From Swiss-Prot:
Residues 47-58 are annotated as: Important for receptor binding. It holds the Pfam family Parathyroid. Residues 99-108 have a biased composition (Basic and acidic residues). This is Parathyroid hormone-related protein. GO terms for molecular function: hormone activity; peptide hormone receptor binding.
Length: 121
């Protein structure tokens, strides 16, 4: 035990153990900082790429119509096409009741009374 305490308090290579610990903590925090910085740069590049891609998608329809007939009227932004999701039965049943023939029966409310106690032990 005495040798351990002496070796622990004696500086190694001119540096104390506390200084080495601080250096290690600083290295870890610098590594984390660089990692976070790289992550934010990557996120910024991804956002820029998606923004550029979305801008191309929004202008693709205008470009396509202008290439086909340059003198014609541009297509309106709003379309009156009916959009359908799902089937006609969608609003009739709850998801748990799909394909059930029985109708819903109300169950009697429980009256407040004795509560079950857990088993001791």
């Amino acid at each position: 035990v005495g040798v351990f305490l002496l070796s622990y308090s004696v500086p190694s290579c001119g540096r104390s153990v506390e200084e080495l610990g601080r250096r290690l903590k600083r290295a870890v925090s610098e590594h984390q900082l660089l990692h976070d910085k790289g992550k934010s740069i990557q996120d910024l590049r991804r956002r820029f790429f998606l923004h550029h891609l979305i801008a191309e998608i929004h202008t693709a329809e205008i470009r396509a119509t202008s290439e086909v007939s340059p003198n014609s009227k541009p297509a309106p932004n709003t379309k009156n096409h009916p959009v359908r999701f799902g089937s006609d039965d969608e609003g009739k049943y709850l998801t748990q009741e799909t394909n059930k023939v029985e109708t819903y029966k109300e169950q009697p409310l429980k009256t407040p009374g004795k509560k079950k106690k857990g088993k001791p032990g």
